[in-house]
Amino acid sequence: MKVIKKRFFKPKEETLPSDEVPDPQSSAEPLHSLFVPDESEEEETTTSPKTNFEKDIIAIVGDISPIIMKYLYAKYSQKRNGAKFAVTELLTNPPDVEKLQQDSIASQSAKRPHTIVSYQEPPNKKVNINPDSASSNNEPLMWQRLIGSLNIQAMATXPDHETVEIPGKXKLKRITTKNSTMANSAIVRVYHNEREIGRIPEDWTRILSPLFDLNIAVFEASVLEETKSRLSTGDSFVIEIEVYLTNSSFAKNLDATENPIDLKKSNFDYSKESESEAALRLRQFAISNLFDRLAIKPLKVNDDTEDEEDISSQEINSGDVEHPVPEINLDQMKEFYQSNNQLKILEGLPETTTPPKENFALDLRSYQKHGLSWMLAREKELDVLEMLSNEDKLSSQSRKELENLGTMNPLWRKYKWPYATEATQDPTQNQTEKYFYANMYNGELSLEKPVIKSSLRGGILADEMGLGKTIATLALVNSVPYDNFPEPKSDRPYASQTTLIVVPMSLLFQWKSEFEKCNNNSRHVCRLHYGEDQETNLAWSLCNPDNSKIPIVMITTYGTVLNEFTRLSKRRNSKGELPKVGLYSVKFFRIILDEGHNIRNRNTKTAKSVYELQSSRKWILTGTPIVNRLDDLYSLTKFLELDPWNNFSYWKTFVTLPFEQKKISQTLDVVKSILEPIFLRRTKSQKKNGKPLVELPAKEVVIEQIKFNDDEEKLYQWFKDRAYASFAEGIKSGQLLRRYTQILTHILRLRQVCCHVDLIGGAHEMDDEIIEAEQDEDMRKFLTSIKENQIRFANDTDVKEKMYNLYGKIKEENECSICTQVPIPYSEMVVTPCAHTFCLSCILEHLDFQKELKKEKLCPNCRSPISKYQLFRIRNQPTKGNEIRFHIQKDAPDYSFQLYLYDPNRSSSKIQALVRHLKALHSQSPNSKVIVFSQFSSYLDIIQSELKLASEEFIVFKFDGRLNMNDRTKLLESFNQPLEDGKVAILLLSLKAGGVGLNLTTASRAYMMDPWWSPSIEDQAIDRIHRIGQNETVKVVRFIMENSIETKMLKIQERKKQIGEAVAAEEEERRKRRIEEIQILFEE
């Protein structure tokens, strides 16, 4: 006969003396469970009264100690329903274990649903009957600290004979039995006045039980709701549990555990899991869930200031409200960069560090001295730092911190103790830390910042453009010119006295010039490794101790490194090593990359060529370490050999993938932890003690809006109509992104018309997509129609007849009847067909005014009809009399000037505005120097020719990517020469070439001929003149065509300044963001 034994747990047996072990085949009369009946069945057999009594007890409360069982049997076995009385005593008034001289009793566990597998129970786990003992760790409790509190709805497990006092102090006890398995959860019971009153829900049991078992936390409970009548079985009541972390919670060695872990199989196969691994899994599960339930959030990794904020607010559950995923932007990144100069490490460094006078001729500014201290500390030259810092010595604490400096482990997050309470229980422990750290991957906790130490001696100097990164770097080189402790072994000869500096070609001679300017030691030599100056046997010239002319600095270009790498790559040996030739034949003392963002793409040959250069110390100088992607930083860390971030799989795991998964805060925390010890950035707007780091003259930027002339306006409107039609069609069809390239073509045309109509049809020079010039029949017809509608001379014969007849009517003392200027300079004079002379700007303004009034265009003097296409200008070149006689059939003398037909389309409205500014500058401030910026090299060509025609007082230089190295150097030297003849020197500079490393402080005026999408690109160009060394107020004029696409581009620039310039993870995402900007361009 079989009977069903109903019970809510399967008892786990404790190891007992052989005479006390219950017969596993014995049975008992069925008892009703308090909760869920078990489906297990056992056969009924005849047993002794003692066995039946024990079975009845075990069926309700689980296995208990043999001594306790013996005590209960002796007391209640002769009574009717004795087992029930025994259970009541166990549940309401447990026996005193000290009196019974018993260490522990076995505990019962409820059967966990088979779909829930959370953690492994430790076997043979014993629980002291004393409720004050929550764990069995042999380590004494030294301190505990409140981490938070929980409100939990508990369930009464037995009828109570009295109400619970409020507040009702209670105890939690974690009880488990010998046979508890993954499928058999233990119960965490609630005790009040030493009697059990209930248990907590199973989901909470799964979280709290490992905290008990692994000695991670201790708990204090209080009953919050008063029961008006006694509790009945199954009643609910609310308890508050205060959770305390203890000193054992922060144990550093988690590879071993005192509590053995049962590795029996469950729904998951943990058969290959060690005890240590199981303990870590339990700990991770419990810690992460506890922090989640307590709403404890990690801090942002900005700093250790008092006003730190949580990554997500504790007031709002992130699961309740949907928030848009924030975009990471360059403005946020700049905030991260800037925070590095506020590090405690930086604050503890001397601010008086000065390079040796016998080596370095210049005086450093205060912030440069501070930066030099940081660079020496990064190179671990602490003795040199103290020697050069005069009386400002390092404290022992600062020295220790510098020696142990490392990057924060990305697996860890920083937390703030949620309550301002000190640790309790042991007054000798001064636990007043504000922060602690947690590793949610394994549940490890730490009071000390977990760092990954690196052997890197170097870093990234990312000071804003114009703060003197070059001088700061040369100060470092002159402070430590060579390695005082050369490495004993290296697979390449060690050039222990030479620093290799890799620069863009345009900066090669500038670096050499800066070195010579600051060098104060005749034995210190700088050598160029470029072109014909390349040394073939570097191993001898740099490593031979007999060579007295070993350079302390050798400067080369990225192109030179790439060329050598490409040539040698074809000759790699069986191990994949490059031949030891040229730059790859030695290991340098130090390598410095100027404009280091040139290697930001790790897949380019330039980056790969630089990776294989060897040195003991490495530095990167860049004002823009991130250009488009966060992965730009990876290439920098790879060059620096910043372990472990130079391993791409590591980088991808903690930076690339989380960013792609929109885990913005997590990614930024990791990026900050990477940059923190190796990165320094200062800005010109940054202040110290209320004063800017560097005192620069004022900078004034003004926008001058210019109106289109007739032809420009017609042409612009025609292109605009076509562009808007294409955009509207893309919106209507929902394929705007697919029409991206076509729309960019239209935008390009509109921008070209704003600059100069001659740019129409040329290949685009600046955008990401290279757009071939379309041969548009409609466009050619339109241009032809414009010319047909212009009032022009009938033919070339008519032009010459009119022009040559004017020679005898032009007087030297000509007066402009509009502005009354006398005489009118030839370079500004214009002659009408009716032989009246005016200033060019005056007559053009007059004609434009007549157009606005919709009146006929007439000569101001004689009222004859005139047109800007029938005006003649004067060159300062002689004209022979026989040339004139040939056309007018009359005698004529020689003249000192030459007339030519003015072409208003040759000089666009913008160029005319530029000429007006330059002429005004010449008259007000002769000997001035000016920079003119544009993105289009072909536009600069047009400007150059127009300026040469406009005035002989203009000296024009043009600097773009088409110049070779020698021509660039000569051009800049000529431009920087002082002017003494009253003329104006004008440097035409492409925006791309002007954004790299040039020092143009001899100029104080700049003109931006066309806007760019990114305001930061324009700012970098302007910083070429507004930087250290500038002594005059800088004025910048930005020419913008009125009511054009350029005014919309200004809106986009302003938008980027407000919300940041987006750094997208993928190319497609960047294109989508550009579409948003395109929509702004086409807004009416």
UniProtKB/Swiss-Prot annotation:
Binding site for ATP: 463-470
Keywords: ATP-binding, Cytoplasm, DNA damage, DNA repair, DNA-binding, Helicase, Hydrolase, Metal-binding, Nucleotide-binding, Nucleus, Zinc, Zinc-finger
GO CC, alphabetical: cytoplasm; nucleus
PROSITE patterns from the UniProt entry: HELICASE_ATP_BIND_1 (PS51192), HELICASE_CTER (PS51194), ZF_RING_1 (PS00518), ZF_RING_2 (PS50089)
Start and end residues of each stretch annotated as Disordered: 11-51
Listed SMART domains: DEXDc, HELICc, HIRAN, RING
Matches recorded under Pfam families: Helicase_C, HIRAN, SNF2-rel_dom, zf-RING_2
UniProt domain Helicase C-terminal: residue ranges: 913-1071
EC number(s) on file: 3.6.4.-
UniProt domain Helicase ATP-binding: residue ranges: 450-643
Predominant location category: cytoplasm
Enzyme class, UniProt record, top EC level: hydrolase
GO BP term, pick one: DNA repair
Motif range (DEGH box): 594-597
ZnF bounds (RING-type): 816-863
Subcellular locations according to the entry: Cytoplasm; Nucleus
Domain of life per record: Eukaryota
Function: Probable helicase, member of the UBC2/RAD6 epistasis group. Functions with DNA repair protein RAD18 in error-free postreplication DNA repair. Involved in the maintenance of wild-type rates of instability of simple repetitive sequences such as poly(GT) repeats. Seems to be involved in maintaining a balance which acts in favor of error-prone non-homologous joining during DNA double-strand breaks repairs.
Name under which the protein is recorded: DNA repair protein RAD5
Species the sequence originates in: Candida albicans (strain SC5314 / ATCC MYA-2876) (Yeast)
Gene (name only): RAD5
